[in-house]
């Protein structure tokens, strides 16, 4: 797993209180990991802070899974 993926996974585990093994590439934040809309906003803010990037609202709406987050952040960093 890449450094970006490790850091994203740590944020997801901390913010959603889920087990690490539940955070898989295709795991949906809402459907699989129990996040609500506020959780997803907080995750995006945490990703922005951790990686020093800005995630526009239209892009944030496309980040639905762990894999989506890793891909977006990898390309933006």
Swiss-Prot record:
Subcellular location: Cytoplasm
Signal peptide: none
GO biological process: lipid A biosynthetic process
Pfam families: PP-binding (PF00550)
GO function terms (MF aspect): acyl binding; acyl carrier activity
Predominant localisation class: cytoplasm
Positions of transmembrane segments: none
Domain Carrier: start-end pairs: 2-77
Alphabetical UniProt keywords: Cytoplasm, Fatty acid biosynthesis, Fatty acid metabolism, Lipid biosynthesis, Lipid metabolism, Phosphopantetheine, Phosphoprotein
InterPro entries, sorted: ACP, ACP-like_sf, PP-bd_ACP, Ppantetheine_attach_site
Residues annotated with O-(pantetheine 4'-phosphoryl)serine modification: 37
tRNA processing recorded as keyword: no
Ribosomal protein among keywords: no
GO cellular component: cytosol; membrane
Known role: Carrier of the growing fatty acid chain in fatty acid biosynthesis.
Family note: Belongs to the acyl carrier protein (ACP) family.
PANTHER family (alphabetical): ACYL CARRIER PROTEIN (PTHR20863), CARRIER DOMAIN-CONTAINING PROTEIN (PTHR20863:SF76)
Protein name per UniProt: Acyl carrier protein
Source organism of this protein record: Ruegeria pomeroyi (strain ATCC 700808 / DSM 15171 / DSS-3) (Silicibacter pomeroyi)
């Amino acid at each position: 797993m890449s450094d970006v993926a490790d850091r994203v996974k740590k944020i997801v585990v901390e913010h959603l209180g889920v087990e690490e093994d539940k955070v898989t590439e295709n795991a949906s934040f809402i459907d699989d990991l129990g996040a609500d809309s506020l959780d997803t906003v907080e995750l995006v803010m945490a990703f922005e802070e951790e990686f020093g990037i800005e995630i526009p609202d239209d892009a944030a709406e496309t980040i639905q899974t762990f894999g989506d987050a890793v891909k977006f952040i990898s390309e933006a960093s």
